[in-house]
């Protein structure tokens, strides 16, 4: 009998610790009054996907949240899948050229491509895992209903 009580007590302790953790996560995802500061948190991995699932209710935007982009779709997808931003790709191309005083005019002009001046496209990982984000920022990745 005492073994059963001990097991029941252990199960109860695990359930309570799990419930308090889930409750603290739900606090971050609860709707807030307008004007009140929203808590921010870092969401990475499974926590990010679960937060998006809860906030967006299964309705998501495409890979990039902005409808119009400075970078062409094929170029941005190549950079996305290679793990390289447009800035990093431009820096790698510039590193392959000889040093400044020796550059020929055509090579020097090639350094001034649009990729140097493009703004880096940021995704949900950049905004919510690399740095903290709020629920309203997470909602910007939800699709229209």
Swiss-Prot record:
Keyword Translocase included in the entry's annotation: no
Signal peptide: 1-19
Disulphide-bonded residues: 44-129, 56-142, 128-133
GO cellular component, one term: extracellular region
Gene3D superfamilies with a match to the protein in the record: Insulin-like
Keywords per UniProt: Cleavage on pair of basic residues, Disulfide bond, Hormone, Secreted, Signal
A Pfam family reported for this protein in Swiss-Prot or TrEMBL: Insulin
Listed name of the protein: LIRP
């Amino acid at each position: 009998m005492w073994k059963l009580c001990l097991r029941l007590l252990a199960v109860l302790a695990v359930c309570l610790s799990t419930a308090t953790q889930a409750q603290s996560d739900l606090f971050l995802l609860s709707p807030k009054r307008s004007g009140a500061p929203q808590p921010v948190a870092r969401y990475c991995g499974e926590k990010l996907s679960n937060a998006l699932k809860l906030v967006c209710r299964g309705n998501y935007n495409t890979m990039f949240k902005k409808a119009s982009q400075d970078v062409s779709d094929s170029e941005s997808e190549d950079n996305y899948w290679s793990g390289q931003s447009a800035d990093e790709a431009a820096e790698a191309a510039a590193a392959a050229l000889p040093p400044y005083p020796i550059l020929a005019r055509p090579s020097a002009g090639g350094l001034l491509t649009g990729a140097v001046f493009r703004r880096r496209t940021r995704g949900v990982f950049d905004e919510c895992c690399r740095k903290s984000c709020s629920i309203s920022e997470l909602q910007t990745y939800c699709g229209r209903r």
